[in-house]
Amino acid sequence: MKKIVFLTNDDGYQSKGLQAIRNRLIEENFRVITVAPDRNMSGTSHSLTFTRPLKIEKIEEDFYYIVDGTPADCVHLGLNVILQNQKPDLLISGINTGPNIGNDVFYSGTVGAAREGTLFCIPSVAFSVGSSKNPNFEDVSKVAVKIVKALLIKNLPKGTFLNVNIPTIPAEKIKGFLLTKQGRGAYKEEIVKYLSPSKEEYYWIGGEEALLEECSPGTDYTAVKDGYVSITPIRLDLTDHKAIDILDKENFISEIVRL
């Protein structure tokens, strides 16, 4: 029996990364249910749309749908409306056209979709390339499918999903796979100011990709920079358990009561 993969992304349904991994999965005899945004929804994180109704459109008979919402909307509607009671074996988000490392994970719609899948207790993984500059998605999809197959054999811990970044180098030059921790920082942050013909001010938030040379050992940055596939386990539970103990020892609650 074919394994069922739920596929989404944040770059939109026409993204080359989405098409490449979809085709690769079908070639590998997976049943692929694709539910993707109808446009680029990068940077939407884990947001759901509550302020307007959403529309699902079937664009191919072969289980291919688009939604006029965020990646998390696609997962939410795909699982509850399209698949209903049929649970997929795995949820894949990507392949993202650019990295999702370090602080990117807080803003990424690609990562947000994988997190949404995890909330539904579905093994989930977010795939991204190490650079947006001319990625070879055919090579990247080959590497991604190896991880997909491993996920169907080895179980993830409950409440955990994977954030995977694959270097944009020829597949034969990739040095291997590393389990990594999340780094810090991702872009040379900048805000660009524009003036309209009527002299109104506008601002563009963005930044240049900047894999820093001074990366800490063991991070997603370092792995990708050194030619390895970075595999970072991310938990749903964001609680800082060490901080609870520290604040308790510092009598933080007692101090609040005293004031």
UniProtKB/Swiss-Prot annotation:
Top EC category: hydrolase
Catalytic activity: a ribonucleoside 5'-phosphate + H2O = a ribonucleoside + phosphate
Co-factor note (free text): Binds 1 divalent metal cation per subunit.
Enzyme Commission (EC) number: 3.1.3.5
Domain of life: Bacteria
One Pfam family of this chain: SurE
Alphabetical list of InterPro entries matching this protein: SurE, SurE-like_Pase/nucleotidase, SurE-like_sf
Cell location: Cytoplasm
GO molecular function: 3'-nucleotidase activity; 5'-nucleotidase activity; exopolyphosphatase activity; metal ion binding; nucleotide binding
Key words, A-Z: Cytoplasm, Hydrolase, Metal-binding, Nucleotide-binding
Disulfide bonds: none
Binding site for a divalent metal cation: D10, D11, S42, N96
Cellular component annotations (GO), alphabetically ordered: cytoplasm
Reported cofactor(s): a divalent metal cation
Keyword Nucleotide-binding attached: yes
Family to which this protein belongs: Belongs to the SurE nucleotidase family.
Chain's role: Nucleotidase that shows phosphatase activity on nucleoside 5'-monophosphates.
Protein name per its UniProtKB record: 5'-nucleotidase SurE
Gene source species: Sulfurihydrogenibium sp. (strain YO3AOP1)
High-level lineage: Bacteria, Pseudomonadati, Aquificota, Aquificia, Aquificales
Gene: surE
